[in-house]
Swiss-Prot record:
It comes from Homo sapiens (Human). It is a multi-pass membrane protein. The gene is OR1F1. Belongs to the G-protein coupled receptor 1 family. It comes from the Eukaryota. Its main location: membrane. This is Olfactory receptor 1F1. Keywords: Cell membrane, Disulfide bond, G-protein coupled receptor, Glycoprotein, Membrane, Olfaction, Receptor, Sensory transduction, Transducer, Transmembrane, Transmembrane helix. The lineage of its organism: Eukaryota, Metazoa, Chordata, Craniata, Vertebrata. It is found in: Cell membrane.
């Protein structure tokens, strides 16, 4: 096997979610609708935060960054799948496959890191309100986001460099709608033990550390809120964090289901469904979840929509 040249497979076939023509047409409309909703919803969040001076706070700064990442995340996978349907092709080059995998992993990491930073921001706001402006300065927030981009790129570069030398000998059909690491490892005729170990160890460290930070933040928040004598005050604090918790649970449950199980136990159908949740559904739902119970954000969104309507 070691002597097999990886160039024997120069491109892959992305089989998508269904091979039935009628289902493919329905899926095309479904994913196009979700993609447009994702871009529009997250773009409205970014515009609202940038236009309304009342939202120029660390919490909304991180939220606008999360919206930007979600737009990029969705752009990495969905347009290629839609283009393949229109052009009636399923091929993607080896380099294109690695590039797509790189950006998918990078935006997953950024989502992961930003959710942790947002949890810390909630922790400081609820548990140390008098020191909030001193701790969460604009300079610190900008440095945090810049640092997250650097760490995410370095982490993804490691996985990509480990994937690049693998050999792919005969089968080039990926039972997925984008180039994900798990189906690629299954296709490889090289020894993928090191890749699996790195994904489960280093990958787990990158995912679990922020998750533990989120848990610790919310444990402190819960203890602090329970000491508040006013029921209205408790509800206000919990409602502020509730939307973030909903996004956290949806994101981490699907990530763990897909990546942190032994390769032999993976089911292509289950993996694909879980992947659809965190690559397509979650980025679409985030703007709705965050704005649903947030009157400040809803007010800013109404202003933006009103400006657009009157300008037309």
């Amino acid at each position: 096997m070691s002597g097999t040249n990886q160039s024997s497979v120069s491109e892959f076939l992305l089989l998508g979610l269904s091979r039935q023509p009628q289902q493919q047409h329905l899926l095309f409309v479904f994913f196009l609708s979700m993609y447009l909703a994702t871009v529009l919803g997250n773009l409205l969040i970014i515009l609202s935060v940038s236009i309304d001076s009342c939202l120029h706070t660390p919490m909304y700064f991180f939220l606008s960054n999360l919206s930007f990442v979600d737009i990029c995340f969705s752009f990495t996978t969905v347009p290629k799948m839609l283009a393949n349907h229109i052009l009636e092709t399923q091929t993607i080059s080896f380099c294109g496959c690695l590039t797509q995998m790189y950006f998918v992993f990078m935006f997953v990491d950024m989502d992961n890191f930003l959710l942790a930073v947002m949890a810390y921001d909630h922790f400081v706001a609820v548990c140390h309100p008098l020191h909030y402006t001193a701790k969460m300065t604009h300079q610190l927030c900008a440095l945090l986001v810049a640092g997250l981009w650097v760490v995410a790129n370095l982490n993804v570069l490691l996985h990509t460099l480990l994937m690049a030398p693998l050999s792919f000998c005969a089968d080039n059909a990926i039972t997925h709608f984008f180039c994900d690491v798990t189906p690629l490892l299954k296709l490889s005729c090289s020894d993928t033990h090191l890749n699996e170990v790195i994904i489960l160890s280093e990958g787990a460290l990158v995912m679990i550390t922020p998750f533990l930070c989120i848990l610790a933040s919310y444990m402190h928040i819960t203890c602090t809120v329970l000491k508040v004598p006013s029921t209205k005050g408790r509800w206000k604090a919990f409602s502020t964090c509730g939307s973030h918790l909903a996004v956290v649970l949806l994101f981490y449950s699907t990530i763990i289901a897909v990546y942190f199980n032994p390769l032999s136990s993976h089911s292509a159908e289950k993996d694909t469904m879980a992947t659809v949740l965190y690559t397509v559904v979650t980025p679409m739902l985030n703007p709705f979840i965050y704005s649903l119970r947030n009157r400040y954000l809803k007010g800013a969104l109404k202003k933006v929509v009103g400006r657009v309507v009157f300008s037309v």
